[in-house]
Amino acid sequence: MVNDTISDMLTRIRNASMVKKSTVLIPFTKMNQKIAQILEKEGFIQSFFLEEDSKMLVLKFKYRSKKTSNAKTKESCITNLKRISKPGLRIYTNSQDIPRVLGGAGILILSTSVGILTDREARALGVGGEILCSIW
């Protein structure tokens, strides 16, 4: 049993995108499902669905074609993922102090009283919360 399901999810996504996999299986939790919805809405993954028989989320990656001098290569839309608030050290912020990731190119995912939100949504609603992770 994994204690930190969010870190496990981010690690699985990072490892699968580094080896250019098309899909990755992630254990289903409501939190992982909400994070996957945000990743899909923000354009970091192509789609996701729940595999009923194994209780796993299947994430389909989105890749960009990158031309080099001699070939075309696939480059993941996800450059990096970083867990910020950890079980041993929780990081909280209010709505005025929510940091920007790469000048707005990346996103923060926050757990707020309204639900799981991106940094832009939290600023617009004027709510703060626990900073779960950053993605760019």
From Swiss-Prot:
Coiled coil: none annotated. Belongs to the universal ribosomal protein uS8 family. It is found in: Plastid, Chloroplast. HAMAP family: Ribosomal_uS8_B. Its main location: plastid. GO terms for biological process: translation. One of the primary rRNA binding proteins, it binds directly to 16S rRNA central domain where it helps coordinate assembly of the platform of the 30S subunit. SUPFAM superfamilies: Ribosomal protein S8. It comes from Tetradesmus obliquus. This is Small ribosomal subunit protein uS8c. One of its GO terms (molecular function) is rRNA binding.
